[in-house]
Amino acid sequence: MKILQVNNVYGEKSTGKLTQQLHWGLLRAGHESVVVYGRGKAVEESHVIRLCPDWYGKLNSLLSRVTGMPYGGCFMSTLYLQRIIRREKPDVVHLQCINGNFVNIYKLISWLKKQRMKTVVSLHAEFMYTANCGHAFECQQWKNGCLKCSNIKKANKSWFFDRTAESWRRMKKAFAGFEQDCIVAPVSPWTEGRAKQSEILKNFRFRTVYNGIDTENVFYWDDKIPEAKTVLNVTAHFSDEQAHPKGGWYLLKLAERMSDVTFLVAGKADNIVNKPSNLHFLGEIRDQKTLADYYRRAAASIIVSQRETFSMPCVESLCCGTPVVGFEAGAPEQISLREYSEFVPFGDLDQLETALRQWLTEKKIDRKVIADDACRMYSAQTMIHSFVEIYGGLSWS
């Protein structure tokens, strides 16, 4: 089979690494594989194509804020992508996360449908079925059609116009009639349950596939790494704003309450002026093996996000033999191994502190057993095998 993946980035950030793992796995298995990505550094790797330079994506991001249409524009790059697909003639096109202002999603879906192209759509966020925001949180409008958005600046970053209703209609029109040639692949049961409530995607076939990681060379248990009795939080962005969806404010408050525990934060962070002395920022850790060592040294990992469609930190932590404690955020409490993790209602610091202290002092765990169980569940090989099955079913249907 020949598979063509499309993603925002390649070889970096969570979806870029997933795309790379899948690409390499397909090649190792004897399949043909091509990756087209929209943003980020140029990669000198065969069968990997960057669609446009970063300035093009930034320009289209700016235009989308003016027009209020988050997934439109990008006419030249969309035509270029269509030419690549025609030239490569793949058996299956796999759309990963494509909300990076490098392709017109409405036009691309409509074109793939018209071509009767066998297509897999991975749901790494909610925008494919909300047609607007990446996380809808408690809003329910996306189910039947967005009207007046009460959170317009965050939902699609529009500066002037509320065109959420138009975006929703365009996305619904693009997907309508594509059910026979397209399979939707959410990354978690939680995301699948949400997508099935949407008028845009509810009539499609679904196959949930967990995100996979490199459990052979990076994320695994190593008893040679000494435990440092720290609590690790891995995040895309740490902020001390209470309303920030990644929940940094709650971790600051928790660290104040647990002054006898050392907390480490890995990820980009705002300039936090007043922070507890027992909380330390490591910055963004790009080297995955270094990150894995921090997981192994930690006594526990902590998740404080308000909403997640998956949770790579949960998976990475468990594969390194480290239990997970956190807030209920949608997917994490569903995809995490229950016997090695615990989640409490979002925002309840009392319950979070109690749970974390129990895992640090009272619960007896075998970290190698945790890692072995997790590696079987979350390996990249498991993910690759699942997608090969999906591709095969589509290409012969």
Model-identified regions with their sequence ranges:
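Short hydrophobic beta-strand element within catalytic cores of glycosyltransferases
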Residues: 323-326
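Aromatic "clamp/platform" in nucleotide-sugar-dependent glycosyltransferases that forms part
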Residues: 306
